[in-house]
C-alpha cells in the first residue's frame, strides 16, 4: 500500500482507535497484513526508507481480543483451540498428518472446534503471514504460545485437560 502525506498526517493525529476511526480508515486492518514502509523522497528520489512497528496499532484495532480465552478451552470433553494472529492470512492446525483450517474472528483470533478424540494428541499451528524481512508470505509452524503441555522434546503442543487426573 502507498499512502500520501495527508493520510499520514490525519492518521497520526489519532491517539485512540474507536469504531468511528475504524469506519473512517477501513483499510488499516488489511494494510497491516502486508509490507508497510515509510519512504522520504526529495525531487521524486527516495532518500530514506524504514519499516514500521505495528504492535501498538494491533492492540488498538483488536481490543476485544484482550478478553478472549486463548490456547485450549474445554466444553465438556470437547476442546476448542484459539490463537491470536491478527495479521495472518491463513491459520491451520497440524494434527498428525491432518491440516485443519481455523476460522478468523473479527478480533483477530483464529478458532478451531475440536473433537473428543483429540485429547492427548500433539499439534502445531501453521500460520501464513507476510514477513517484511524476506518480502513474502511464509508459513510459520509454531507451538501454541498458551500450551499447557508439550511433547517430551518440546517440539509440539499437546491437547491436554489439566483438570482430568489421568492427564498427569
Cite the ranges covered by each PLM segment.
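Extended, well-structured beta-strand/loop surface patches
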Residues: 96
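The feature marks proteins involved in alpha-glucan
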Residues: 2-76, 80, 99, 105-168
Amino acid at each position: 500500500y502507498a499512502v500520501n502525506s495527508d493520510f499520514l498526517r490525519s492518521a497520526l493525529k489519532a491517539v485512540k482507535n474507536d469504531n468511528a476511526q475504524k469506519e473512517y480508515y477501513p483499510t488499516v486492518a488489511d494494510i497491516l497484513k502486508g509490507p508497510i514502509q515509510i519512504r522520504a523522497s526529495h525531487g521524486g528520489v527516495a532518500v530514506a526508507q524504514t519499516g514500521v512497528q505495528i504492535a501498538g496499532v494491533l492492540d488498538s484495532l483488536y481490543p476485544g481480543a484482550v478478553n478472549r480465552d486463548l490456547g485450549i478451552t474445554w466444553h465438556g470433553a470437547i476442546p476448542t483451540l484459539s490463537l491470536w494472529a491478527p495479521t495472518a492470512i491463513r491459520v491451520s492446525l497440524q494434527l498428525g498428518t491432518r491440516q485443519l483450517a481455523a476460522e478468523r474472528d473479527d478480533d483477530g483470533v483464529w478458532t478451531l472446534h475440536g473433537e473428543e478424540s483429540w485429547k492427548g494428541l500433539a499439534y502445531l499451528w501453521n500460520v501464513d503471514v507476510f514477513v517484511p524481512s524476506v518480502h513474502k508470505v511464509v508459513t510459520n509452524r509454531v507451538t501454541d504460545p498458551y500450551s499447557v503441555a508439550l511433547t517430551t522434546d518440546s517440539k509440539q503442543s499437546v491437547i491436554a485437560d489439566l483438570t482430568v487426573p489421568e492427564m498427569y
